[in-house]
Amino acid sequence: MSIQVEHPAGGYKKLFETVEELSSPLTAHVTGRIPLWLTGSLLRCGPGLFEVGSEPFYHLFDGQALLHKFDFKEGHVTYHRRFIRTDAYVRAMTEKRIVITEFGTCAFPDPCKNIFSRFFSYFRGVEVTDNALVNVYPVGEDYYACTETNFITKINPETLETIKQVDLCNYVSVNGATAHPHIENDGTVYNIGNCFGKNFSIAYNIVKIPPLQADKEDPISKSEIVVQFPCSDRFKPSYVHSFGLTPNYIVFVETPVKINLFKFLSSWSLWGANYMDCFESNETMGVWLHIADKKRKKYLNNKYRTSPFNLFHHINTYEDNGFLIVDLCCWKGFEFVYNYLYLANLRENWEEVKKNARKAPQPEVRRYVLPLNIDKADTGKNLITLPNTTATAILCSEETIWLEPEVLFSGPRQAFEFPQINYQKYCGKPYTYAYGLGLNHFVPDRLCKLNVKTKETWVWQEPDSYPSEPIFVSHPDALEEDDGVVLSVVVSPGAGQKPAYLLILNAKDLSEVARAEVEINIPVTFHGLFKKS
């Protein structure tokens, strides 16, 4: 990866500024030549409103959800955006204050109410946010924006209008679900969320939503729990942002970042707290890796253990001759990385941003190899017999398998994050290339391509330019894994530049193919997808 770049001008602060939605799409100015085969829409979610009246949101994952769309047709591009009409957004706009508690911001009772009304409003129970700012994904013929609670929001991908809120609790037993479901080529959706299992203890359920059937009924109404993972702590589930899926196995990585449910239910209801207040780290747990047989719908009680890390994004998982290969974007240690993503930190001047990031867990791309066939006679031995990996799996005397990873990429305070692959063809299969957003002390300032076999990297980077998660779009006649383009939304506040643009790169070498510039700022976006025409 390229050398570290400095950002003394602080242009990254534009990522965290409130913007207005658009009444109609804008025509973008295209330089270069957009491939004619690239037709469809890039849909992305992120925060677009960072304060309500005089009340600020405090955390990166608090701002109200803004849905973005870049349309591609015959070499032309338009840009549109609208706020998602969630309950959190509509009530905030109506009451001109923050009404529903967000990830790192507490909502307090209406100050206009008398003291008795305000007191009793604390006892209404936990009001969970539906602020769908993290991702968008398809279910059948429909599209849903999501956060990580039990609420998802159905949207119109053409007009960006909000259609309705859906509560997953009405269909399956989960307290929430991740923003990174897996979608198989037939349209089947898998996701994971924590739940109350036997004896009121916490567990993790895998949810399966079938593809659209001939009866055209909403697939969500046919959701089912297919397998359950146990929890290492009876009353403290781990934070889960993604999981691994292959044709035959489901992989769940249980990290030491825990949600204290007693704190969640008591302090929130009684005196006010937010989600961030309810996280804590188990400093002795390390990381537990769990697997389940997907086809037999059975949990496999292999005890995989390793040293502590934070995990938000799986890159890919696949099977290889009796082993599971699990590639992850890790952050070393047990301290919660989100502690460093408060907006006050991210909006600091460059030297302060660097100082804060130096205290945080450090990033590393890792490959773990999980043996599936365990012979107790091999106690004390490395069970991995695959060539071309330095990862190890030692069978310990207590029948646990201690894992040490192969490092695929490591750079001090230089993260390879928000990973993407040629998902449609290579998810759950052996692959070669991953694309990622390069974070420089948490500031996104480059796009990266990683060869996971040779560890070779390619980088796109320009001064005063702050890209988003790269989205890979395969060429319709692709012959190789990386035949296609990479799309990224770039904020460019530097002198002489348009405020933002959609960047199109050749997926082979990250050379620029074209860009589509707009005259308005675009705030940070987290995740999204390319919807082909």
Swiss-Prot record:
Keywords: Acetylation, Cell membrane, Cytoplasm, Endoplasmic reticulum, Hydrolase, Iron, Isomerase, Lipid metabolism, Lipoprotein, Membrane, Metal-binding, Microsome, Palmitate, Phosphoprotein, Sensory transduction, Vision. Interacts with MYO7A; this mediates light-dependent intracellular transport of RPE65. A lipid is attached at residues 112, 231, 329-330 (S-palmitoyl cysteine). GO terms for biological process: retinal metabolic process; retinoid metabolic process; visual perception; zeaxanthin biosynthetic process. The lineage of its organism: Eukaryota, Metazoa, Chordata, Craniata, Vertebrata. The gene is RPE65. Its cofactor is Fe(2+). This is Retinoid isomerohydrolase. It comes from Chlorocebus aethiops. Its EC number is 3.1.1.64, 5.3.3.22.
